[in-house]
Amino acid sequence: MKKSWFYLWFTLTTLSAMSVCTAATILYPVVVGGRWGYVRKSGETVINPQFDRAEMFAEGLAPVRMGRWGYVDATGKVAINPQFDKAEDFSEGLAAVKLGGGGPAPFNPFGIGGGHYGYINPEGKYVVNPQFDDAGTFAGGFAAVKMGGHWGFIDKTGKIVINPQFDDAAAFSENLAAVKLAGHFGYTDASGKMAINPQFEKAQPFSEGLAGVRTGGKWGFVDKSGKVTINPQFDDVGSFVKGLAPVRQSGHWGYIDPTGKFVINAQFDEAAAFSEGLAPVRQSGHWGYVDPSGKLVINPQFDEAMPFTGDLARVKSGGRIGYINASGKFVWNPAK
């Protein structure tokens, strides 16, 4: 399912960062004159712009590119020297890194190209040597890895716990992982047993006990037993967060509750999941934010907008990146 850039960013970085940081300690990447650094939620510069690229912090370290990828700590000190062609966020004490193949992106779980992935610890030492064609983040003690054209799962020692056999695989979420087998998606448990048999055209990770699945060209939701709880009727869906999930119907996005009832009517051109009580929505070509009642608390005015991480949300205006607070006021102005 095609998603906007903010969906990918939110899923792959914000959640991991928020699991280990408080709003008081989160640092935000900014770009000045083509160089990247970090600011606090107040807009105060903490790490001067000096990197080719910088990503969000997770578990106290952030991937940064200085020709090649390495990691810095919250003081800006290089904790792991730049040496990788790709570097993923830390999750559960390990980070997937790639040697060979190049590429500017810090994390590409389904990327293509040469090189091999392995996993390092916060000291930069390999815990799992580079050997995989592709690799995802650890979740629930397991990570999806690709070998010989198929996906399986390893534990934190690098031991294969579910043999590579799948055409595609996502990270574990709520003890189940979406996998693709023989052209259809289902869900496996940590033992490798199919908890929900492959039967769907597409499948999303579980969130709050429900997962979006597509069948017959329409999206609905199933519970962990595989029972359909919300009939397939939507053109697209996102994940449930605090009882609300974005869905698209008849060309517009709104939000439903776990019974499938619309809480916020379908009226937006695009919409993302809630975070910190607000959700990005696009209307008339611009992005703003709504609260759980559907009220526009920050009027549509941005070219792009991401979900809130702590107290701030990253937005783009006039081609420049900035950060706003929950009132919509710029803390880091895109003009900088």
Spans of model-derived segments:
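Bacterial N-terminal signal peptides
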Residues: 9-17
